[in-house]
Amino acid sequence: MKKYLGLATLTTVAALVLTACGGGSTASTDSSATIDPAANADKSITLWLAGGDTPDELRTYLTDTFKDQTGATLKIEEQGWGDLVTKMTTALPDPNNTPDVVEMGNTQSPTFTNIGAFADISDMYEELGGAKLIPSFVEAGAVDGKNFTLPYYAGSRYMFQRADVWEEAGVDTPTTLEEFNTAVKTITEENPRDIKNFSGFFLGGQDWRNSVSWIFANNGDLAKKEGDTWVSTLSDPDTLKGLAQIQDLYRNASKAPSDAKDATPWLYINDTDQILDDEGEATGKTSLAAATIMAPGWAHWSIGDLAKQDGKDVREWNDEKFSAFVLPGNDGNPAPVLAGGSNIGISAQSQNPDLAKELMRIIFSAEYQNLLGENGLGPANADYNAALGDDQFAQAAIASASNSKLTPAAPGWAAVESSMILEEFFGKIRDADDLKALAEEYDAKIDPLLNLK
């Protein structure tokens, strides 16, 4: 998930949260049997949801079910991804202003769990799903074997192609990573429709979240823990193999700008589209400029022919034009991709921990997990993956998620992302004459950020 925060702000996270939270509290172990709806009529708790990924249908289910089961009121407040960390830093230490339950990006979780911002919910782990919960997300929310946040939902990345353009270029869907790299370079060279600045694979110059798949596929990583210290690994030999492939794609398959990130790549695979600002106002137009993009699974709702539904513009998927497939790895199995999604936890300063735990029970219930899947969000509990369906998007999502990875669980990882240093590094790869020297330069810049607490 996207998270941006000024570095100076993030370095104060630990001080602010530790001042109020100490080492992190333990949520009450009282069961739902102690909840008296009549006694809770005047009580309320607040849930922070990040961005708009949770559909209105699910929000209504949460508020209605919470009211029915507890008698209390659930207030849902949506927080933008751009300032979520800043708001968490300010609100979580303050018992008078803290939200009771918080959704955060899975890569943000380690920063806050390591400094006591969330209550210990280890006593609920088995009840909420136990080993069926997404392991990498559970790990991101754990400290010293204790659980502080758990998975909320998962989203996996896969490839969307203009099947018609691939066919016109005479290129088949690849079965290995090498075949994919060759295919998109060939399509760029063939450019069957003679489109200006055409990309066989649109990969933004600063798009590290998708590019990292090539690093993972070559057994590299962004960082690793050595003893008690985290170190950046951009210059490790295996990582450099992946970076060399990325550089080749930047130079020979993608005409994306060197400062383009991972936002809205579908604008370039649709026949026509609009560039919208934060308020939803159109600021420009795009036309077909790429044969392939990589994006989270929910992007398929933004891909297709333009149609009208209830007087509104919608995208209608067209199997004759579009297709989805999993990025293949070197061995033909799904390549490792960066998992998207969120974790969720109870604030250590919540004044209503029992009610907060009731909300967690509702979120991890079979009913809600199935609702997540039915709305295209990967359930936290693998038992409910069938709710995703069996169409090409569900199949790609499940296959892609089977080999997904998270960013390093370093306490300062949010500082790395917020500093935009990875965007800066990847933006220099295309024109780098010495990848190893560039990687070593940025290893030295990233190392101190990784260990911020």
Q: Could you say what each language-model-derived stretch is?
A:
Residues 148-152, 157, 181-232, 238-241, ...:
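Extracytoplasmic/periplasmic solute-binding protein
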Residues 91, 98-100, 129-164, 199, ...:
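A structural signal for short loop-to-beta-strand junctions that line the ligand-binding cleft
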Residues 36-39, 106-157, 214, 317-325:
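Hinge/lid segment of periplasmic solute-binding proteins
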Residues 301-312, 338, 342-415:
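Mature extracytoplasmic/periplasmic domains
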Residues 36-37, 122-133, 192, 199-201, ...:
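Short, solvent-exposed loop/beta-turn-alpha elements that line the ligand-binding surface or hinge
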Residues 197, 221-306:
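Extracytoplasmic ligand-binding clamshell segments of periplasmic binding protein
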Residues 4-10, 14, 22-111, 319, ...:
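Conserved N-terminal structural module of periplasmic/extracytoplasmic solute-binding proteins
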Residues 73, 167, 400-453:
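Conserved C-terminal helix/tail region of periplasmic/extracytoplasmic solute-binding proteins
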